[in-house]
Amino acid sequence: MIRVLLADDQQLIREALAALLGLEVDLQIVGQVGSGDEVLGAVALLKPDVVLLDVQMPGTLLTDGIEAAAALRDAGAVSESGEPVRTLIVTTFGRPGYVRRALEAGASGFVVKDTGARQLAEAIRRVHAGLRVVDPSLAADSLVTGASPLTEREAQVLREAASGGTA
């Protein structure tokens, strides 16, 4: 069972995500928070495997999900199983600059809120397994707009996928 904490300032979004992800037999929503400042305390208390973080959330110390991801990484946050807590950014603001910042902050993935429920559940599973997940269109934009947060191998795979090939 993958233990998931949801962090989004919009209650309707949090509750909808909890309801949809709760239908997955291998995912357990262990908590929900509405601000960046609540993330560290909730992680320390609930010890989730994966934290879904919105980019823009209110807070005085941690004002966005990217800062929260960095704080969790820097604190060495661990899950109930003793593994490092992994973070997945889920946001409306799908900009290449955010993608780079998130990955530099230690986030394991970045997807937009337009992502379907099944794809989001799969992204959580992949992040939990230690893989990096980046929305394909954002990854492609990142390649075009400057320094890429992708490794050379990831960029090669993306180029192959975009051209219809396999790597």
Task: Report the location of each language-model feature.
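Conserved acidic segment of CheY-like receiver
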Residues: 1-13, 17-21
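Two-component signal transduction core modules
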Residues: 32, 51, 87, 110-111
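Active-site residues of response regulator receiver
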Residues: 54-55, 91
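Short, flexible helix-to-coil linker/hinge segments that flank and couple to helix-turn-helix
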Residues: 97-158
